[in-house]
């Protein structure tokens, strides 16, 4: 039996950081809007946003070498790094606003100051990182970045990485104290608690079965209650699909033209997690290395301090795995079911093009635990097998789409899809994802609430003072805003 509910203004599908962010922004900008949220699991932030299902890095390009490209002439293109840092500044400003206005409390439960570092081995890589730092330090967003090859200084930063190191190859480290570790699961839960207090209806254990456009222009969303097995249809003026890996199959159900010729390739991740508290307590940094030649961007190895429920942890990875599931809690049929007549050529083209990714995944799947530990010892020479365990992180669905130039291009980023009339939006892809959630949701609002957005700008600038500016070009504004953000988020 299917029951029909009255019309609502907004439906958010998925209980992760993206829906939580969009819902919070809408309640700030247009409090009268009626919002409903549907989440398949029993509580919010349990898939991609869960603390163990992502790296928890506040992505700001302070340590991620894959955000800067080296040219053949030795110059370094930092445009992507600067853009990502600017996006993360927007997220931090919004979170600080929510703390300031009493909507988020105890910021240390979701964000911690953790230095961000880069680590390279070999003359060519050392030359690259020197050029990278020299270029970035010209920008105010990276003014605190340090570089060292001095053994004692490096040891003071990360003793575990220097002790026992026998190789004669040169190494270099960068260090930036303004880095952060973010528990996106805890942040998501806090945002949804606040939304419930403001009248947003959040329903858990709800599986969205279908999304169809009506002649009236509204959307019908069919939802199954997983406890009662009852099906209910809801009507809404606007629908946002922010369901992690499930966003692609849900987008395909809408039938909009933007859902055609697009596919997804799932990649799972494994990490080594330290079980020795003495070791954990001797490392305080997120240290990113350089991906191997031919390896995809999500393969960048990193040794990470994490904070979970106030307790420090230490992880190393990721090691790639393969599962046809689009969600950690998904079905083994997800990948097969996502192949449609309109995207089969797209998917096959990607398969032919991305043989290097296939080889990389096969090599990763064949790794033994001893081989994973050998990879860890490149970072931490004295690591002992008995101090580490393997954990499975979340699923990431990399977007495959056609472009004007060619078919089947694998995208390693976050992609916003909107219908022509702006009544539906979907978020696909992976990193930098959650770190840039606020800026991405501003993009959704600009594209989907075109008539209202201009009137919202004064409130937006109250929440995010840098909105409409590039902090890169306004050094004094950056320092003023950063002082405020630091104060409310209690980070450096």
Swiss-Prot record:
The keyword Disulfide bond does not apply. One of its GO terms (molecular function) is L-malate dehydrogenase (quinone) activity. Its cofactor is FAD. It catalyses: (S)-malate + a quinone = a quinol + oxaloacetate. InterPro entries: FAD/NAD-bd_sf (IPR036188), MQO (IPR006231). It is an enzyme of class 1 (oxidoreductase). Pathway: Carbohydrate metabolism; tricarboxylic acid cycle; oxaloacetate from (S)-malate (quinone route): step 1/1. Its EC number is 1.1.5.4. One of its GO terms (biological process) is tricarboxylic acid cycle. The keyword Lyase does not apply. Pfam families: Mqo. HAMAP family: MQO. Belongs to the MQO family. This is Probable malate:quinone oxidoreductase 1. The lineage of its organism: Bacteria, Bacillati, Bacillota, Bacilli, Bacillales. The gene is mqo1.
